[in-house]
Amino acid sequence: MTLRIFDTGTRSLRDFEPIRPGHASIYLCGATPQTQPHIGHVRSGVAFDILRRWLIAQGLDVAFVRNVTDIDDKILTKAAENGRPWWEWVSTYEREFTWAYNQLGVLPPSVEPRATGHVTQMVEYMQRLIDNGFAYAAEGSVYFDVAAWTAAEGSDYGSLSGNRVEEMEQGETEITGKRGAHDFALWKAAKPGEPSWPTPWGDGRPGWHLECSAMATWYLGGEFDIHCGGLDLQFPHHENEIAQSHAAGDGFANYWMHNHWVTMSGEKMSKSLGNVLSVPNILDKVRPVELRYYLGSAHYRSMLEYSEGALLEAAAGYRRIEAFLTKVADVEAGQWTTEFEEAMNDDLAVPRALAEIHTQVRHGNSALAAGDVDKAHEIAASVRAMAAVLGVDPLDEKWLDSAASDSSTNAALDVLVQAELQRRTEARAAKDWATADEVRDRLHAAGITVTDTPDGPTWALNN
């Protein structure tokens, strides 16, 4: 079965056909390090790490570029407010993002370019746009001429977001010298006290959109397979990337993939709303692999509504996989099931893929209970293969090395708690409510919360 992905550009499911057979090229809009990473930031990293892992598992050689926007208005403002040099400020938080990605088992990118290291490529890109008649210099800045581009044959401006030009607001603060209200800055003229770089049009610094076109095409070529990012980047950032890239003569990305937000009480997690939960804060509640499991458990195009209950339920789900594999112990990864493959090839339907993993875990536990060790090993090998694609294989060195003692302790605890839960289930079936309540209360006194679900009871440690 061929991988089908939802292409935002065409608003349809499309078969993935890489430009070069056996290879895949992916560009992901990475961090703008201005503050501590929160779980909304890293959801994108986890979502497209799963895409990358699935392509690798299919035998493709994947070139994966994730940029760092290390200069922009917000970084300069934050650094100034805190009395710190801008480069020190951004370096501090870039390290925190790297730490967060590593904690969650996100594979390092093939290359992680910084905007400030690619000014030469940006200058070349701007010159091409000026030569083609789609950009102009004005008082030290360089702007993209939206009117000229929309009037050009083959222009598709607005097609990604579905917006009409007259409805678009670019949010640019610079207006001096702009020919049109919708034009956006490719290069911003130097201001006193701000960092700047020399160009033929004057000293200044990069505009937000230009950097990604320049870096993506520098490392992946003028045409590459997939461009990824958060839904909030669809407009204006990705729309403008497409415009300037096509206007420069590049085919750019063949597929566009966007992950949805993490929300709290229906609101997008955002620093401006004050509803963010930092990665270190969440890791006080669960292990890194459990947070990864949680962030990857919803479909990447679905909103992920955060609640502590949902986080702990996801952690309990991971522990069920972990407990089974720990009981089977020494087993190599085998082959995933057909159901898992069909789910992953259906636009990365991770909820279905996880459901298949848990189905196999139940079968494996039944085999162990029946004394069929060979069958249990066969199932465990399949479970390892499937969990590895999602980056949550409990027997992977990443998780064994980082939490070996926690892993064995939790697995042993799970065996004991499951025995108590089985006793409670039997008591409830016999309408022996006193015994059922006694088991629940004893677990609660030990710091364990029991939640009844359609698939049976789950448990989680209280904070």
Swiss-Prot record:
One GO CC term on file: cytosol
Any single biological process term in GO: cysteinyl-tRNA aminoacylation
InterPro entries named among the record's database cross-references: Cys-tRNA-ligase, Cys-tRNA-synt_Ia_DALR, Cys-tRNA/MSH_ligase, CysS_C, Rossmann-like_a/b/a_fold, tRNA-synt_1_cat_dom, tRNAsynth_Ia_anticodon-bd
Segments carrying motif 'KMSKS' region: 268-272
Entry EC no(s): 6.1.1.16
One GO MF term attached to the UniProt entry: zinc ion binding
Subcellular localization, as worded in the UniProt entry: Cytoplasm
Organism: Corynebacterium diphtheriae (strain ATCC 700971 / NCTC 13129 / Biotype gravis)
Protein name, UniProt field: Cysteine--tRNA ligase
Keywords per UniProt: Aminoacyl-tRNA synthetase, ATP-binding, Cytoplasm, Ligase, Metal-binding, Nucleotide-binding, Protein biosynthesis, Zinc
Catalysed reactions, as listed in the record: tRNA(Cys) + L-cysteine + ATP = L-cysteinyl-tRNA(Cys) + AMP + diphosphate
HAMAP family: Cys_tRNA_synth
UniProt record similarity statement: Belongs to the class-I aminoacyl-tRNA synthetase family.
